[in-house]
């Protein structure tokens, strides 16, 4: 059973995760990109699975367990959109876990893509595979959301050219991050070919409420 998830940041009111992914898919359809191709399914309190929903995938062709990606961690966010600008939809999942280089449990960002494969029955199907399972971004990650290319020429920095003008088809991942001195920043990250890299600050060195307001715009 798919459960709708919601962000639990204090004093932050955002759309449920499933709804936000659906909104991303609707925006993608308006730009000629394919409809939503992923679902996040909850199997227990701390076990989730990212599954491919595009094409001819169904349980008879090997099932979600064979074609999806298992996430045995708490999940705080789920978004979909074209991260690397290749014209196909990717999945962004926020999980709470430690990593090899940062063993303390914290909010992380995983990015997944679909690839062509074969089910256990030998039939063609879509499989979910990781693009990036990064240890961390720049600061202490609190939340993130996907910004489609058409949305990135925002009014927070009018000096930047629009993505339509530059021809950049990559979406941005907008991150709400805290710092070691208890301040907050909102930053944009873009795909660099082998992971996410810092692109620009939207706002920095501010209190939590100001950062949340900017992040939510």
Positions of the model-derived regions?
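Bacterial N-terminal signal peptides
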Residues: 8-16
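Bacterial N-terminal signal peptides that target proteins for export
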Residues: 1-6
